[in-house]
Each structure stands twice: as structure tokens, then as C-alpha cells.
Curated annotation (Swiss-Prot):
CDD domains the record matches: Obg
Keywords: Cytoplasm, GTP-binding, Hydrolase, Magnesium, Metal-binding, Nucleotide-binding
Required cofactor names: Mg(2+)
EC number, UniProt record: 3.6.5.-
Name of this chain's protein: GTPase Obg
Residues annotated to bind Mg(2+): 173, 193
Gene that produces this protein: obg
Native species: Halorhodospira halophila (strain DSM 244 / SL1) (Ectothiorhodospira halophila (strain DSM 244 / SL1))
Domain OBG-type G span(s) in chain numbering: 160-335
One of the protein's GO biological processes: ribosome biogenesis
GO molecular function, one term: GTP binding
Lineage summary: Bacteria, Pseudomonadati, Pseudomonadota, Gammaproteobacteria, Chromatiales
Length: 346
């Protein structure tokens, strides 16, 4: 299925039904009073979170969605039937904006959560409401009001605890395959990952976290080069970023892992200073390609070259070396953050 993370379309709620002008007419009651009923309300349009969806592709071609209008009122004080609401399923993590004004309408962050995006019109009043001591037979009623209509912009921002950052071919996809049930494509050429991938890491019973892998970032990404920049927004909700570098880039392709890491950080800051301020851990990958006696020094060498003062890990996503320790520390860090947040909101 094609991954689509931005769409625009128009929604229109149903109009309210008109009020009714009607008089009571029964045997032996030739001149009964007014009994016109109210119109039914128009159906509203809602977006509903669905954890089974991970793309907005269903809204790529359909550009208009409407709810049902309410029916007119009837005699004998019968209220018209209300219009049926329109429910549009969207992936959890969908940000909803008014395309015309730029207003943020809301954020769908939970499965089953509903967000009202267009309210149905109110039903009109029947002539029963206009009876008075001076007007016993009113012939007036009101029309139903129009339902809301607006153009929406939806942006999907995947919900993940941890984001993987790196240049193309540093082994992000291999790592996410090793630690989770996700199965992204793995191959020895750039941009194997074309779309964001999510993986659930089950560290122990009842302990898990979600990892997001996006296409690799290259120099000039903030100006649109490569594939990764348009997906960086999917890391905006993460609590922790893992900055992966290739520990054998120099030996295998004459690369410089320190320069690569500096390039990625510069692109990250150019795209979003706020994203660049998120906690980041340095992860030196592909150590299995080095002799065992060289691995620790290679990790330390890269960390020194970057002036890195945060956590540093040496791993092999292919063989699993160092991965258990990394996942355990991630789990503990995330749980500590959650406890801290719970304490602040208590």
C-alpha cells in the first residue's frame, strides 16, 4: 500500500431540517391550535482514530465528504429525523488543520478518539413555538441552519517513542528488523527505506516501546534533497532519537563517520531547531565488520571526533551485539521520563 502522509479535502455537515407550519385537525376540533414540529438537526462530520491504519491514502483521490441533512418537522409536534453523522477513519497521530485559515482544529492521538470537524446545522422551529396570547394561530416557522463546510489539511505524524536518525546505509533498517517484528527492506544501496517504518520492541513482558525508522538524511536535505526530510516530522512526537553512524564507513567506502554525523546534525537543525534539541544517543553500528580488538576504540574515536557528551553505544544490528543493553537502557529511560511526566501532572 502506498504511504501518504498529507492530504486535503472538503467536508460539509448536513443542514438542519425546516420547522413545520401545521394545525391540529381532529373530529370535533375544527379549529385546533398549532402543532408544527421542529426540523431535525443536520449530521456532523467527525474524524475517528483507527490504530489499524498507517496512511492517509484513502483520502488521496476522494476530495469531498458530506453528512446527511435533517428532515423537516411534521404535524402533531413531530420532530424531523436528524441527519446521520459522517465518520471518517484516520490513523492515530493525525494532525488536523483548516486549510483556509491555518487554524489547528485538533490532533487525533488515540484509537477510537473522535474529533468534530464540521458541525451539523440546527433544526428550524415549528409554528408551535410562536403561539402567544395575541397570536393563537401563528403561520410562521424557521428554516434549519446550514451545516458547516470547510477544507481540511491532514498531516500524519507517526506516534513513536524512539526515532532512528542516520545517513543512508548506516543499518537503521537492519537494526529495526533485529529488535522488533517490523520487516523493512534491507539492501546494500542508498534509500532502501522509502517510507517511515514502525516497529514495536517488546523488551520484557508488559514492557515495550515503539521505534520509527525514516529514510536516510543527506546533505542538502533541509532544502529538499533526498527522501528523508519530508519524513522528519514523524520524529516530532518521539521522546528520544538514536543517531546511527556506520562504524566501518572509512574502510568500506572511504567515508568519514564523524563528518556524516555532523552533516546530519546540521540538516536536523536547519529543518527544526526544536527537533534538534531532543535527547539524542550516539549509536555506532556495524561493529561486526571490525576485528574485536578494534571495536571499543573505534566507538571512542568517533565520539571524541564529535565531542559527544551524551550516551554512546557500539552495536551490530546484524549479529545483535550490544543490542540488548541498548534496548534495556532505552526502556529504562522512557519509563523514567513517563514517571517524571506523571509526577508533574499529578
Amino acid at each position: 500500500m502506498r504511504f501518504v502522509d498529507e492530504v486535503t479535502f472538503v467536508v460539509r455537515a448536513g443542514d438542519g431540517g425546516d420547522g413545520c407550519v401545521h394545525f391540529r385537525r381532529e373530529k370535533y376540533v375544527p379549529r385546533g391550535g398549532p402543532d408544527g414540529g421542529d426540523g431535525g438537526r443536520g449530521g456532523s462530520v467527525y474524524l475517528e482514530g483507527d490504530e489499524g491504519l498507517n496512511t492517509l491514502v484513502d483520502y488521496r483521490h476522494d476530495r469531498f465528504f458530506s453528512a446527511e441533512s435533517g428532515e423537516a418537522g411534521g404535524g402533531r409536534q413531530c420532530t424531523g429525523r436528524s441527519g446521520v453523522d459522517r465518520i471518517l477513519p484516520v490513523p492515530v497521530g493525525t494532525l488536523v488543520m483548516d486549510e483556509g485559515t491555518g487554524e489547528v482544529i485538533g490532533d487525533v492521538t488515540r484509537d477510537g478518539e473522535r474529533l468534530l470537524v464540521a458541525a451539523g446545522g440546527r433544526g428550524g422551529l415549528g409554528n408551535l413555538h410562536f403561539k402567544s396570547s395575541t397570536n393563537r394561530a401563528p403561520r410562521q416557522s424557521t428554516e434549519g441552519t446550514a451545516g458547516e463546510s470547510r477544507e481540511l489539511r491532514l498531516e500524519l505524524q507517526l506516534l513513536a517513542d524512539v526515532g532512528l536518525l542516520g545517513m543512508p546505509n548506516v543499518g537503521k533498517s537492519t537494526l529495526i528488523r533485529t529488535i522488533s517484528a517490523a520487516r523493512p527492506k534491507v539492501a546494500d544501496y542508498p534509500f532502501t527505506t522509502l517510507y517511515p517504518q514502525l516497529g514495536v520492541v517488546r523488551y520484557e513482558a508488559q514492557r515495550s516501546f515503539v521505534v520509527a525508522d525514516i529514510p536516510g538524511i543527506i546533505e542538502g536535505a533541509a532544502e529538499g534533497a533526498g527522501l528523508g526530510v519530508r519524513f522528519l516530522k514523524h520524529l516530532s512526537r518521539t521522546g528520544l532519537l538514536l543517531h546511527l553512524v556506520d562504524g566501518v564507513a572509512e574502510e568500506e567506502r572511504g567515508g568519514d563517520p564523524v563528518a556524516d554525523a555532523q552533516t546530519l546534525l546540521a540538516e536536523l537543525e536547519a529543518f527544526s531547531p526544536e527537533l534538534a534539541q531532543k535527547p539524542r544517543w550516539l549509536v555506532v553500528n556495524r561493529l561486526d565488520a571490525l576485528p574485536e580488538e578494534m571495536r571499543a576504540e573505534r566507538v571512542a574515536e568517533i565520539a571524541r571526533g564529535l565531542g559527544w557528551d551524551g550516551p554512546v553505544y557500539g552495536i551490530s544490528g546484524l549479529t545483535g551485539e550490544g543490542v540488548d543493553r541498548l534496548c534495556g537502557d532505552i526502556m529504562n529511560d522512557l519509563e523514567a521520563r513517563r514517571r517524571e511526566e506523571d509526577g508533574e501532572t499529578a
